[in-house]
Amino acid sequence: RQMCIRDRFQRGRPAASLLCTKEPCIAVNTESENRSTFWYGDFDEPSCKFRTWQIPCSSHDSLYNLVTYYRLGYGTESLHRLGRELEWEGYQGEALDTPYYFVFHAAFEALYHWVREGIPAPHAPKIETEMTYAATDPTGVQAANRTDSLGNALGGIRYPAADCPTSVCQSYTVREDGGLQQMFGTEYPFPPEKLKAVYGDLGHYRALAEKSADNAVAHGWILADDRDELVRIAVETAARRGL
């Protein structure tokens, strides 16, 4: 059903929306999915109202949505009933914990206004990719996200974790035994020396984070109500990592 608006070779014309209905749809993808979804682009046709929102410096699961959320008490009964514990299983770097969930807040609000009021959702650039025709990482996907000079994905919805990163992010985790947590990402924090070389001091970093957040709000990718919290998290993360 998805093939009506996606095409790995970026050809073709849609006949319907994601679920072959006339209702609007916003496909929000992290770096765990964007290389294998191959969305053609956005559409505003009567039979296909569609947006692709792609978030760099993210993974399908993160420390917040797979570990912290449950430790706060949400859903713990279900976990206990299943006899499961949710943990990051990496042995290098840190569990990915970029606050990309704020983008989902904006996506839900945009979708509501699109469905209820006919106000089209904002457009967003796709993460820049290139076909490799061979596996580029342990997940086996034959496409790669192009990266900037700091090692993170180019394009996509920009927010402080992507515009002024304090780590290199990857969308999967390698266990010590060589196995994978394919949908739970890893961050490799920059050493304090690199943070200082790139950003100077925490005051300058805050200014960059505020500029990034303001740009995201202006484009409709972040809610205005979430702006200050997004900046706070970015600055506190930079300080914790030694800036």
Residue map of PLM features:
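Short, small-residue-biased leader/transition segments that mark boundaries at the very start
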Residues: 1-5
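Conserved alpha/beta-hydrolase "acid-adjacent" motif
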Residues: 34-38
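Alpha/beta-hydrolase-fold serine-hydrolase catalytic core, especially in secreted/extracellular enzymes
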Residues: 9-12, 18-23, 28-31, 41-51, ...
